[in-house]
Amino acid sequence: MLKRLLRLPVRSYHSSSSEHVKSPNLGPLNYGKDSPQYAVLSHAIKVSVPVVGFNERALVHSLNQLNYPSTMLSIIGASNSPSLFHSSPAVMELIKFHLVDKRLRLVEDLDQESQEKPSLEDLLLKRLEMNVPVAQHLSQLLSHLAIPGPFTVETALPELHRLSDDLIYYSSEKDHPDFAWYSKRIGLSCAYVSSELFMAQDSSANYKETFEFAKDKLERTMQLGEYYNNTEEWAWYTLLNTINLAKSQMARG
């Protein structure tokens, strides 16, 4: 696990403009928008996942709708190692695609040269709004992200960091290259994850309570400096979910 952490590509200690230059590629995905993988995964996220969730059925449904053979599943999941707890490498790729695609779409229409930037709250709420079509399946998504292993270390956590980094960089939030740079991003990451957890259980109309929760969580995190409490909260969330998932898997035999 430590070796994997050391091999991970990391962003510099503080943001530089070169890290946020928009490009046609979809890194860290290893395929482009003109590829069969992108066609299937994009269709699955838009059409199949809102109905059946983040699972292989969603992929099979999209393969059938697009007239691709079922053997495409192995191609879609080729970049992911098999996992004991994850359902399949293809589903892991579906989750990765969801995380990366939504992060890129969040800022694709923003003008980097504009002097007027959206607030951090606006961008956070916009990202949560992107979850509305799949909100009823967020518990399933989050359970995958909480599983310890290569996928969590190499995909889920780096994507969460990239999201928090982009939220701050593209917003009007003031940023400084000091110790608070890192703690601010951890706090924002935890505020976002907490909001997703809330949304997964929210039954209010149009997820109104989720957005109110997110506003309050963000304000307490960014204005009152709940960085360290949030870090502890994230650690406990991951640990407890891991234990509960392991117990569930053992009970099933």
Language model features by range: what are they?
Residues 4, 204-253:
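C-terminal peripheral helix-coil segments that are non-catalytic and often amphipathic
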Residues 108-137:
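Hydrophobic alpha-helical connector segments
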Residues 131-151, 158:
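Amphipathic alpha-helical segments used for helix-helix packing
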Residues 151-172, 185-189:
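Amphipathic alpha-helical packing segments from all-alpha helical-bundle domains
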Residues 1-30, 253:
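N-terminal mitochondrial targeting presequence
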Residues 88-104:
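Short, basic, alpha-helical segments at the C-terminal edge of helix-turn-helix-like DNA-binding modules
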Residues 27-71, 78-88, 92:
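Short, amphipathic alpha-helix enriched in basic
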Residues 181-200, 214-220:
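Hydrophobic alpha-helical segments that form the core
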